[in-house]
UniProtKB/Swiss-Prot annotation:
GO MF terms held by the record: hydrolase activity; symporter activity
Protein name in UniProt: Low affinity inorganic phosphate transporter 8
Protein purpose: Low-affinity transporter for external inorganic phosphate (Pi) that may be involved in the acquisition of phosphate released by arbuscular mycorrhizal (AM) fungi (e.g. Glomus versiforme and G.intraradices) during AM symbiosis; not required for mycorrhizal arbuscule development.
Chief site of localization: membrane
Gene it is expressed from: PT8
Induction: Accumulates in roots during colonization by arbuscular mycorrhizal (AM) fungi (e.g. Glomus versiforme).
GO cellular component terms, semicolon-separated: periarbuscular membrane; plasma membrane
Transmembrane segments: 21-41, 71-91, 99-119, 131-151, 163-183, 211-231, 295-315, 347-367, 370-390, 415-435, 458-478, 491-511
Locations listed in the record: Cell membrane
UniProt miscellaneous comment: Although related to the sugar transporter family, it does not transport sugars.
UniProt xrefs under PROSITE patterns: MFS
Length: 557
């Protein structure tokens, strides 16, 4: 029987097998749902505003009040933060597998309920929607640490970064599909329920059938994740958790034998090292030992993720406001309610296809060649430069309202929407081929097995607190500015400074490329020291540790 050290070596040295790809799909579908549910709301908030907050005395389409808009877009992020902390801790206490199914069930259930938000008044509809989206976010939050840690503990040493990045890249696919589904559903409804634009007829421009559009869009995200529920439940516990945390080395071997090539396990089983992790490194999260070993690491992962998400979510959640002013979408009064969803989602889809998704997959293919550290540094730096130019030249890129002729479909004219789109696209590309991916990957590698999920959850929660700053703080600042153009310019330039801070905080995070998880976390030294002490003790007593003396074929811990 292979020892637990042999199992860990087997995992690190295993060739890429079909099960690795299956694990990517299973974990990745959770992230597909995560991204879809968090970002599809951007495509439909303006529709909800037209449906529930229209004012007949106002000569412009209905919009969500700033506080309501912030609540709808930000409440899921609050739930996500809570879920990351809770399920991250629970994943270390109960095991990755036991908790994994709970997060998926929560996501699927509350994604469906979000589309069934009920009430006869705007207040009750929005309240029920926010309630369901908070708990949707709670489930999404649990998927962050669990998916990252499961993939890192299953993966081999050579391609671990690419595998974790591939799981996270499904976030990009989720953003793309969110735009695609909203575009398809709105186009379908436009064909069957045409209506004049707002300027032609303010009342008829808001089709009552639009109430089905936003509900269908919100509910669709549950479908792909639900299809993977069976396989998620069939996944065995990771060998690293079973061996290093539970101390059940025999079961770790049996579990991995089910999913990995048995020949690989037998080839690696001739090690004679038996590890006793619970005795050799029992320091806790709040101990001075953890602070000495990993305090700066945790500061680095939390600070960089926090700073990144301020900028990333500010851009993603304000797309609905940025696109019309940049000339990528018609002004609201020149569209009916469902057409506005189509225009916004088409812009979202195009930007995701050209900039967002390629950034994720560049990380997948290049992370093991360039390394996490360099990708994160380059990403933060390019984001900072692009956003500085975008903010500094915002008015010239946007154009002027006075330059538009009567009957123009655009809010601003004589700007430079092409240059705006290029800089905006580059920012998103280098966010994803940069810190948005690496801040997810590195916390799943840096910390010891029994604290790995907790520390990833803490890092991710720090990121979501940054996202909340973006969703509530940045959006409120722009929304409450007397001169929205000036407010947007100042906000974008401030985000450039935030990215620059992320660049410098990256130096707190070490490179993890090309090393085993046990070497990175320091567990390997603990194992070696523990076994050396046991061997010396055995020699003093005239005997040697049984797990060292026995032949590999009969050694069992």
């Amino acid at each position: 029987m292979a020892t637990s050290h042999g199992v860990l070596r087997s995992l690190d040295n295993a060739k890429t097998q079909s099960y690795h790809y299956l694990a990517i799909v299973i974990a990745g579908m959770g992230f597909f749902t995560d991204a879809y549910d968090l970002f599809c709301i951007t495509a439909v908030t303006k529709l909800i505003g037209r449906l529930y907050y229209s004012d007949p005395t106002n000569h412009s389409p209905g919009i969500l009040p700033t506080n309501v808009n912030n609540a709808i877009t930000g409440v899921a992020l609050c739930g996500t933060l809570a879920g990351q902390l809770f399920f991250g801790w629970l994943g270390d206490k109960l095991g990755r597998k036991k908790v994994y199914g709970i997060t998926l069930t929560t996501m699927v259930g509350f994604a469906l309920l979000s589309g069934l938000s009920f009430g006869s008044t705007p207040k009750t509809v929005v309240t029920s929607l926010c309630f369901f989206r908070f708990w949707l976010g709670f489930g999404i939050g649990g998927d962050y640490p669990l998916s990252a840690v499961i993939m890192s503990e299953y993966a081999n040493q050579k391609t671990r970064g690419s595998f974790i990045a591939a799981v996270f890249a499904m976030q990009g696919v989720g953003i793309l599909v969110a735009g695609g589904v909203a575009m398809f559903v709105s186009k379908l409804f436009l064909l069957y329920f045409p209506a004049p634009d707002f300027e032609t007829d303010a009342v008829l421009s808001t089709q009552p059938e639009g109430d089905f559009v936003w509900r269908i869009v919100l509910m669709f995200g549950a479908v792909p994740a639900a299809l993977t529920y069976y396989w998620r439940m069939k996944m065995p516990e990771t060998a690293r958790y079973t061996a290093l945390v539970e101390g059940d080395h025999k079961k770790a071997v049996e579990d991995m034998a089910k999913v990995l090539d048995r020949n690989i396990l037998s080839e690696e089983s001739n090690t004679r090292i038996a590890i006793r992790p619970l005795e050799s490194h029992s320091y806790g999260l709040f101990s001075s030992e953890f602070l000495n070993r990993h305090g700066l690491h945790l500061l680095g992962t939390t600070s960089t993720w926090f700073l990144l998400d301020i900028a990333f979510y500010s851009l993603q959640l304000t797309q609905k406001d940025i696109y019309p002013t940049s000339g990528l979408v018609y002004k609201a009064s020149k569209m009916n309610a469902i057409e506005e969803v189509f225009q916004l989602s088409r812009a979202m889809f195009a930007v995701a296809l050209i900039a967002t998704v390629p950034g994720y997959w560049c990380t997948v293919f290049l992370i093991e060649k360039i390394g996490r550290f360099r990708i994160q540094l380059i990403g933060f730096l390019v984001m900072s430069v692009c956003m500085w130019f975008l903010g500094h030249n915002y008015r010239s890129f946007r154009g002027e309202e006075s330059a538009c002729k009567n009957g123009s479909k655009y809010s601003f004219c004589n700007g430079n929407p092409v240059m705006f789109a290029i800089l905006f696209g580059l920012t998103l590309f280098f966010a994803n081929f940069g810190p948005n991916s690496t801040t997810f990957i590195v916390p799943a590698e840096l910390f010891p097995a029994r604290l790995r999920s907790t520390c990833h959850g803490i890092s991710a929660a720090a990121g979501k607190s940054g996202a909340i700053v973006g969703a509530f703080g940045v959006q409120s600042y722009i929304g409450n500015s007397h001169d929205k153009s000036k407010g947007t310019k100042q906000a974008i330039m401030a985000l450039a400074v935030v990215n620059l801070l992320g660049f410098f905080f990256t130096f707190l995070v070490p490179e993890t490329q090309g090393r085993s998880l046990e070497e990175i976390s320091g567990e390997e030294k603990d194992f070696q020291g523990n076994n050396a002490d046991e061997e010396i003790s055995g020699e003093r007593n005239g005997t040697r540790n049984a797990s060292v003396d026995k032949s590999p074929e009969t050694s069992m811990v």
